[in-house]
Amino acid sequence: MRTKLICALLALCLFCSGCSVMDLDTQNLMSPPKATGDKADIQRVIEESAGSYTFKYPQKGDYRSAVIMHDINGDGTDEAVAFYKSNTPDGVSDITVIFIDQISGEWQRIAAFQNSAAEVERVCFSDLNGDGWDSVLIGWSNYSSANQATVFRYENGEVKPSDLEYSYTDLALEDFDRDGTDELFMSSVNTADKSAAARLLKYSEASDSLVNVSEVEMNQEVTQYASFQAGELENGYRGVYIDGVKSGNQMTTELVYWDPEEQKLQAPFYSSDSSNKISLTRPAGVTCMDINEDGVIEIPAARPFEGNAA
């Protein structure tokens, strides 16, 4: 009887208190706090531009926020790059990327661009032309292996877009030729026409754009990538180690590097002549890694136990 009375009194207290059980609904608990300071001003600019909108978040890479702060004009202070889709009655709208800068103490929209892709695949920052500040590379995805990319440069108060003509499955920004400026390495697999290739794009002053300076064929048996790592080779060259998945739950490793003597990409493990291919095929599940922490990536290889037939 005493226990029942205590339970009844506790229930009555909860019912009468300001923090009622009904106030603890999921929506209230998950509502984010209001932005303050610069973030509030940036949010205001987005709302003025978009009206009703939904943020879009990059799917891969180091930058996964819908609003990314980064210095893209070399003035020593960060600008904002944001992604959203406008909410429309039919639910159909392009992704918008908006560039926001603080001018004379006020955050303002500088430019906005639309893309019909389904997702923002990734965002990268790199000084690709040697002007001393970073360009913005945005990858766009339509849920296939053929991603597209656009490079944006913010200079003289204007944002200039440049769509790259090549699609990619994965990419890396690295100084492959050791000239102090990053190059863009792009590789792709196309299961429809059974093609695979890697290419290196480098800034050209003549065209004021990224141009393809070298291209090499890769293993057409690969259907998708399991791992993609840029790293150092034992000879000091820079390359990309790619673990690719083949049919039958098999995996192989491809290496593509920039050869400074030949001034082109090399793929030493691949040959169009099947008799000259170096086989690194193994059961899927184990990818390349720097096992001994010497700065050089090691490649796994499968071999039968001693006494077993190969």
Residue ranges, per PLM feature:
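Sec-dependent N-terminal signal peptides of Gram-positive bacterial secreted proteins and lipoproteins
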Residues: 2-23
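Beta-propeller-forming repeat regions
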Residues: 19-310
